């Protein structure tokens, strides 16, 4: 059964174009989503918008007057090409429009997310930190409280698009006429205009301002990680809900420690004599203060001592990484006569030990000699 488009607008079948437009504008002022957020009103607004679209088009109105419904075919084939499936999408991509009506985007929309870089040193990443930062962002207009209007004035449906937020154009192609829908240039797709806008925000419902935000960084964060602060981003147009603020951590290089995930690496220099005889040194760990490390006798250059659980805290648990201490053996560059004599004596003693080992192997008493005799019967 065909819809009663005249009844939806409350006009007679003999109504003029001006009468139809006047009736639609009166109903749109009451039912537009930006004016009346009730769900029933929104459904009614869609119906009267469809009725106005039909009756304001001479060809579609002629079909109605003959007892037909021009929107039934449109519902069966929203792309305008019936059984040709996605052919309408091809023409949409080619011509930059669409024959399907999308409706107004709404004046009140969510705000954008914001990204704030923050530089932290290794200690702050390890312990966590709370900082006050200043951001330049979009905030709610305090004069109109986001309405965008001046005083008691209110938005009204756009005359250009009739509150639909889009205008339709007819293009001729080799396959015939194509009806494409584009955002209305007057209301920019919103569907309403503000005749008396707020003098502070000029109808946008928000203004640019600098504001202080408290940022709490948890312990264990690392370079490139982002901390999300819900609803701390930009306020949306028309006083819409604010987006989120993302704080991106940039970790500064440390003078002593190199970070590898939750593990830390550092290098300590140990005198040659201490490496040979053994000693105890102290390392200033990030969270544990001064830690004592035992250097075993005979420690070689490049040795790594692992201190478990003394690295960085894990972001989402109570565990910690390890501290890896790389030993660098320092060889003295300046020796007095006494030091030189001591080292030469040590060299002679070590040389005798090496000679004794070699003579043992030459006499056949070595391990490899015995193995050779076993497998070769020599």
Curated annotation (Swiss-Prot):
Zn(2+) 2 binds at residues 158, 161, 184, 187. InterPro entries: DnaJ (IPR012724), DnaJ_C (IPR002939), DnaJ_domain (IPR001623), HSP40/DnaJ_pept-bd (IPR008971), HSP_DnaJ_Cys-rich_dom (IPR001305), HSP_DnaJ_Cys-rich_dom_sf (IPR036410), J_dom_sf (IPR036869). Zn(2+) 1 binds at residues 141, 144, 198, 201. CXXCXGXG motif repeats lie at residues 141-148, 158-165, 184-191, 198-205. It is found in: Cytoplasm. CDD domains: DnaJ (cd06257), DnaJ_C (cd10747), DnaJ_zf (cd10719). GO terms for cellular component: cytoplasm. GO terms for molecular function: ATP binding; heat shock protein binding; unfolded protein binding; zinc ion binding. Binds 2 Zn(2+) ions per monomer. Residues 4-68 form the J domain. The keyword Cytoplasm applies. It comes from the Bacteria. Its main location: cytoplasm. Its cofactor is Zn(2+). A zinc finger (CR-type) spans 128-210. It holds the Pfam family DnaJ_CXXCXGXG. One of its GO terms (biological process) is protein refolding. Keywords: Chaperone, Cytoplasm, DNA replication, Metal-binding, Repeat, Stress response, Zinc, Zinc-finger. SMART domains: DnaJ. Homodimer. Participates actively in the response to hyperosmotic and heat shock by preventing the aggregation of stress-denatured proteins and by disaggregating proteins, also in an autonomous, DnaK-independent fashion. Unfolded proteins bind initially to DnaJ; upon interaction with the DnaJ-bound protein, DnaK hydrolyzes its bound ATP, resulting in the formation of a stable complex. GrpE releases ADP from DnaK; ATP binding to DnaK triggers the release of the substrate protein, thus completing the reaction cycle. Belongs to the DnaJ family. The J domain is necessary and sufficient to stimulate DnaK ATPase activity. Zinc center 1 plays an important role in the autonomous, DnaK-independent chaperone activity of DnaJ. Zinc center 2 is essential for interaction with DnaK and for DnaJ activity. NCBIfam families: PRK10767.1, PRK14278.1. This is Chaperone protein DnaJ 2. The gene is dnaJ2.
């Amino acid at each position: 059964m065909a819809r009663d488009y005249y009844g939806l607008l409350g006009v007679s079948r003999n109504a003029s174009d001006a009468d139809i437009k006047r009736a639609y504008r009166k109903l749109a002022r009451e039912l537009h989503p930006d004016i009346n957020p009730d769900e029933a009103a929104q459904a009614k607004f869609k119906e009267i918008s469809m009725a106005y679209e039909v009756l304001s088009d001479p060809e579609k109105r002629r079909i109605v007057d003959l007892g037909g419904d021009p929107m039934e075919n449109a519902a069966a084939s929203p792309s305008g090409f019936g059984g040709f499936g996605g052919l309408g999408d091809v023409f949409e991509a080619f011509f930059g429009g669409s024959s399907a009506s999308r409706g107004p985007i709404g004046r009140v929309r969510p705000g954008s997310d914001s990204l704030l870089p923050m530089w932290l040193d290794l200690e702050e990443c390890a312990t966590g930190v709370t900082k006050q930062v200043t951001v330049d962002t979009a905030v709610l207009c305090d004069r109109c409280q986001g309405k965008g209007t001046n005083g008691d004035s209110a938005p009204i449906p756009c005359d250009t698009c009739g509150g639909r937020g889009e205008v339709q154009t007819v293009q001729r192609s080799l396959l015939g006429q194509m009806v494409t829908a584009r955002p209305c240039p007057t209301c920019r797709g919103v569907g309403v205009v503000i005749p008396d806008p707020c003098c502070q925000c000029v109808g946008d419902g928000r203004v640019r301002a600098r504001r202080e935000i408290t940022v709490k960084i948890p312990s264990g964060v690392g370079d490139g990680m982002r901390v999300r602060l819900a609803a701390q981003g930009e306020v949306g147009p028309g006083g819409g809900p604010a987006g989120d603020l993302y704080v991106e951590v940039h970790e500064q290089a440390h003078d002593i420690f190199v970070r590898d995930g939750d593990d830390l690496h550092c290098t300590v220099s140990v005198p040659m004599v201490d490496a040979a005889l053994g000693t105890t040194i102290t390392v200033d760990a990030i969270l544990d203060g001064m830690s004592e490390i035992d250097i075993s006798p005979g420690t070689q250059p490049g040795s790594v001592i692992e201190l478990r659980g003394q690295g960085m805290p894990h972001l989402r648990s109570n565990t910690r990484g390890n501290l890896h201490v790389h030993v660098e053996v320092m060889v003295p560059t300046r020796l007095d006569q006494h030091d030189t004599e001591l080292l030469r004596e040590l060299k002679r003693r070590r040389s005798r030990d090496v000679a004794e080992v070699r003579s043992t192997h030459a006499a056949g008493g070595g391990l490899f000699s015995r193995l050779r005799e076993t497998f070769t019967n020599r």
